[in-house]
Amino acid sequence: MSQTYQQQLQSKIERITHQFAEFNPPALEVFESPEQHFRMRAEFRIWHTDNDLFYAMFERNEDGKQKEVIRVDEFPIADQSINQLMPRLLEELKANPTLSQRIFEADFLTTLSGEMLVTLIYHRKLDTEWESAAKALAEKLNIKIMGRSRGQKVIIGDDYVVEQLNVHGRTFKYKQIESSFTQPNAEVCQKMLTWACDVIQGSNQDLLELYCGNGNFTLPLSLHFRRVLATELAKSSVYAAQWNIEQNQIENIQIARLSAEEFTQAYQGEREFRRLQEANIDIQSYEFDTIFVDPPRAGIDDETLKLLKGFKRILYISCNPDTLYNNLKTLSQTHKITRFALFDQFPFTHHVESGVLLELI
């Protein structure tokens, strides 16, 4: 029997509460997701039969080896705009062999306002005939299209969408680039940003952020600090973050293209980086009292954990409670949890997004 939304949420609450009980956190703050139409992106295989074309996903059988093809005619967890476009796009592909020949995947990326980018992926070279057909399709459906094949990328319109998220009455614009990481659940993302700003409660000193991505948290958090230094290694994310800072007219943020490990080396004076000099970033000019981290699923490495322990406040957003738990074993030696939250980014899956504010004991 399948669980209701509230049942699956309650099981996550119980699991997280039990897992972190040894750290004696305050009461868990819970932020729910819409039950349907919450995903702003979706990826499907395009399945070909003798006389049909349809969206497909794969489901492994019980032994985990054989994959079963599941036909997908609608996708209730995806945003309404994706569900509305899916059949229209499929009919256009079926009607035009130039667009359907050797296509094997279609990826959708949308925004709360309905702006749409569709990536069509092929097992063949994309020629001028394809480009002409794709331009006509983009115009007809009022979407942006990206064509991809091995070693080839053809952009019809733009390779990004612009999301607008509201935090405490202010709207922030975010460039979200195709194939770069973005938060998939925009409604819950707004709740995460609002919570992060609420728990910080302002500072007359500076914020250090590691793993900043496209500046998702950086922009709203910057309003609560004198200056912000944010680090990110991926070039496309750094580019998007710089665009977002400029578009939102925020002037107290600098972006350093460094990994967390590299920043630790630079901060401790162990290594100099030309990238910092070229960006005119003087780390020693900052007076940090707070560090914000939103690391990948693997969590934070030991050297970076040592860096975190030197900060008065640590705001940690985690997409993996197991690595957060392991990191807290170290951080709880010097800090205590003063805020604790669960964000249901991924309803009906085992994945849990959580947040903790840690303050120096």
Curated annotation (Swiss-Prot):
Catalytic activity, reaction form:
uridine(54) in tRNA + S-adenosyl-L-methionine = 5-methyluridine(54) in tRNA + S-adenosyl-L-homocysteine + H(+); uridine(341) in tmRNA + S-adenosyl-L-methionine = 5-methyluridine(341) in tmRNA + S-adenosyl-L-homocysteine + H(+)
Q: Which residues form a coiled coil?
A: none
In its UniProt record, which GO terms are filed under biological process?
tRNA methylation
Top-rank lineage group of the source organism: Bacteria
Q: Where does S-adenosyl-L-methionine bind?
A: Q183, Y211, N216, E232, D294
Gene Ontology CC entries for this record? cytosol
Lipoprotein in keyword set: no
Q: Which residues form the active site?
A: C319 (nucleophile), E353 (proton acceptor)
Which UniProt keywords are present, listed alphabetically? Methyltransferase, S-adenosyl-L-methionine, Transferase, tRNA processing
PROSITE patterns linked to this entry: SAM_MT_RNA_M5U (PS51687), TRMA_1 (PS01230)
Q: What is its EC number?
A: 2.1.1.-, 2.1.1.35
A Pfam short name:
tRNA_U5-meth_tr
* InterPro entries reported in the protein's UniProt record: MeTrfase_TrmA_AS (IPR030390), SAM-dependent_MTases_sf (IPR029063), TrmA_MeTrfase (IPR011869), U5_MeTrfase_fam (IPR010280)
**Molecular-function GO terms, alphabetical:** rRNA binding; tRNA (uracil(54)-C5)-methyltransferase activity, S-adenosyl methionine-dependent; tRNA binding
* HAMAP family recorded: RNA_methyltr_TrmA
Provide the family line. Answer: Belongs to the class I-like SAM-binding methyltransferase superfamily. RNA M5U methyltransferase family. TrmA subfamily.
Its function? Dual-specificity methyltransferase that catalyzes the formation of 5-methyluridine at position 54 (m5U54) in all tRNAs, and that of position 341 (m5U341) in tmRNA (transfer-mRNA).
Name under which the protein is recorded: tRNA/tmRNA (uracil-C(5))-methyltransferase
Task: Please name the source species.
Answer: Acinetobacter baylyi (strain ATCC 33305 / BD413 / ADP1)
* Upper classification of the organism: Bacteria, Pseudomonadati, Pseudomonadota, Gammaproteobacteria, Moraxellales
